[in-house]
Amino acid sequence: MQEIEIFCDGSSLGNPGPGGYAAILRYKDKEKIISGGEKFTTNNRMELRALNEALKILKRPCHITLYSDSQYVCQAINVWLIGWQKKNFAKVKNVDLWKEFLEVSKGHSIVAIWIKGHNGHAQNERCDSLAKLEAQKWVKTTT
């Protein structure tokens, strides 16, 4: 299986409010950037949207190392998700996106690594800037 790195970040202005997401996918010396946003959302939803949209791009099963400054996303992938499924996602927020994650992550092996946000990690900083730009686009449509 191919080794892929995914860096992702989500932003929400107001939380909830206008939001944006960005992800960088790296394979060897190739890089792909994706981004987008929504009119009314949360930072956690945008973080998860970034990951899901990145996974949709992959055409074959991969070993994925995910880097995120979201403890929510990293803990969910590495620890909580199995328990959530056993309890049929009772009291879990963003169930729609977690169920989508389960679908788009099928066949992949994913290890999520938490990185401290706003701490000079180049790819995280890039994703953060792109996600904020996407969120700003939606501010103009809500005023």
Curated annotation (Swiss-Prot):
Write the signal peptide boundaries: none
What molecular functions are annotated in GO for this chain? magnesium ion binding; nucleic acid binding; RNA-DNA hybrid ribonuclease activity
- GO annotation, cellular component aspect: cytoplasm
Residues recorded as binding Mg(2+) 1, renumbered to this chain, are 9, 47, 69
Gene name of this polypeptide: rnhA
Protein name from the UniProt record:
Ribonuclease H
Enzyme superclass (EC): hydrolase
Principal subcellular localisation of the protein: cytoplasm
Q: Which domain of life is it from?
A: Bacteria
Q: How is the cofactor bound?
A: Binds 1 Mg(2+) ion per subunit. May bind a second metal ion at a regulatory site, or after substrate binding.
Q: What is the lineage of its organism?
A: Bacteria, Pseudomonadati, Campylobacterota, Epsilonproteobacteria, Campylobacterales
Protein species of origin: Helicobacter acinonychis (strain Sheeba)
Task: Output the PANTHER family linked to this UniProt entry.
Answer: RIBONUCLEASE H1
Task: Give me the segments passing through the membrane.
Answer: none
Its localization reads: Cytoplasm
Q: Which cofactor does it need?
A: Mg(2+)
Function, in words:
Endonuclease that specifically degrades the RNA of RNA-DNA hybrids.
Q: Which residues bind Mg(2+) 2?
A: 9, 128
